[in-house]
């Protein structure tokens, strides 16, 4: 996809903060399975809509499964246009990188939120010894620890083993390493009386992460980056499939922006907020994400030239 040259005197009054698993990447294939998602993202970027991916995924996953398909669809030309901005915040704010016409830039990491190599090695060994049939250790994470469902395993089989894994990893990290950790109704303080980490289950993985990490932190970092590059739109949309994704909109609302959140998995319970919460009818996950992007593409996205 290429775009005709355009002089930019003003930018669209819209910015997007997007979770990836669910609204962009299919939770089944873990890739962008709907082609229009790719082309609509490229068109919106070309129109000058600032777009940030705020995800628990690693930079490697976003580079391979999101940025590379976008580049193949013309993202480089889109990001050379006046006002175009794209950014990635990974591991819920533990790492981040610019995305420009050359692809993803150098990844920066906040080492202060890492569990450390020894703890990661222990979790890796636990998975290999007891849980390798149903899940795998994500080698691409730089700060948090993630263990993900094997793609060929049925969800019901994974869920039963996921609970057993979480109990086991809690015992390893608190007992062997003295890590201050929260897990559902259980908690163990470290030697300083603190609990700086938590076990956070998702529908396809278990994340072990700093309590400082979440989608509001990622949103704040993306806004800071975009503000360095130009004026910010007043109107924003955030899109996600989990309850924690509302925190992106919470951050924007607290900062005084006009925001609405698009919940692509409302069956988990729509949260009450002081801003609008939108659903895409009966559509869920990436089908809902595709419908959302198609709507805004029709409003702002330029046609290929």
Q: At which residue positions do the language-model features occur?
A:
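A short, Lys/Arg-enriched amphipathic alpha-helix followed by its capping loop at the start of a domain
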Residues: 6-17, 36-49, 252-255
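Mg2+-dependent phosphoryl-transfer enzymes with acidic/Ser/Thr/Gly-rich catalytic loops
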Residues: 6-12, 209-211, 216-305
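Asp-based phosphoryl-transfer active-site loop
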Residues: 9-31, 53-55, 88, 219
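Short loop/turn segments at strand-loop or loop-helix junctions that form parts
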Residues: 16-22, 90-94, 99-101, 139-142, ...
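Active-site phosphate-binding/coordination module
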Residues: 35-139
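Well-ordered, non-membrane alpha-helical segments in soluble/globular domains
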Residues: 35-38, 67-73, 114-127, 158-183, ...
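A short acidic (Asp/Glu
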Residues: 62-66, 99-100, 147-150, 246-252, ...
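Conserved acidic, metal-coordinating active-site core of Asp-based
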Residues: 130-237, 244, 248
